[in-house]
Amino acid sequence: MKTLSTSNFAARFLTAVALVALLAWPMDAEAQFFKKKENRYTDPYKGFTEEAYMDMDFLPNISTPEVHKKAKSGVKKTIRALAEQLKNKVTVDLVRDDEVVLVTFPTDDLFLPNDTMLTTEGTALLAPLLPHMKNPMMYKIVLAVHTDDTGSELYRDELSTARLNSVYDWFMLAVESGQIQENLIIIPFAMSSTMPLADNNTRDNRALNRRLEVYFIPGPQLIDEAYKGQLK
């Protein structure tokens, strides 16, 4: 039987160890690369355009821009403060792990039954939101109008679209009057009856499902100042 000399055995052993290390290196390097990429701070102003968000569906819009983990604490503190300021005037919830303020209005308070024009009382209910929208880089705004399941699918689609247009137009009038700036990003969604809060099996539940949602989503200035520790 052929045997290896001590020197040949050591050489082959070292070669095998080197090969294992070489094969393992790309995996370690790849893991380190993705770890660094995950921790990398991306300029939140990049890609923050109305055109980009208009092309997104509803849920991706609620999820973006993302907040870097270093900025999360500051963003959440600001979002909670906003919710505190609004809670005595409107119905407020915190979503996306306390990174987003959700304001909900029953559409019965904004519109007459089966009507699509905002009432005077409805515009008065929306007005307290405007002072918090003055800085267009602090928040992205998403509007979502929901219906119950009454009537045909076509009717529900048309109703939610018409009501959404009425709300959106009201915000555009606020732009024209100088109450908010033209470059504030407002993304509208007519949701029809696709996302009910409750089964449409009672009158109260149907009323609960008929709603306007207004989302305050962290904008690039809020994220950037939170990341840099510059929030007041």
Give the positions of each predicted feature.
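Bacterial N-terminal signal peptides that target proteins for export
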Residues: K2-T15
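Bacterial N-terminal signal peptides
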Residues: L14-A24
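N-terminal targeting leaders that direct proteins to extracytoplasmic destinations
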Residues: A29-V100, T116-M117, A124, L222
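Extracytoplasmic/periplasmic, Sec-exported soluble proteins
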Residues: V67-G74, N114-E121, L125, N135, ...
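Periplasmic peptidoglycan-binding/anchoring modules of Gram-negative envelope and division proteins
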Residues: V75-R96, F111-V145, V214, Q221-A226, ...
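Short, aliphatic-rich beta-strand segments
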Residues: V101-P106
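A short, flexible beta-alpha/helix-coil linker loop
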Residues: D108-L112, D148-G151
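Periplasmic OmpA-like peptidoglycan-binding domain that tethers envelope proteins to the cell wall
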Residues: T147-Q230
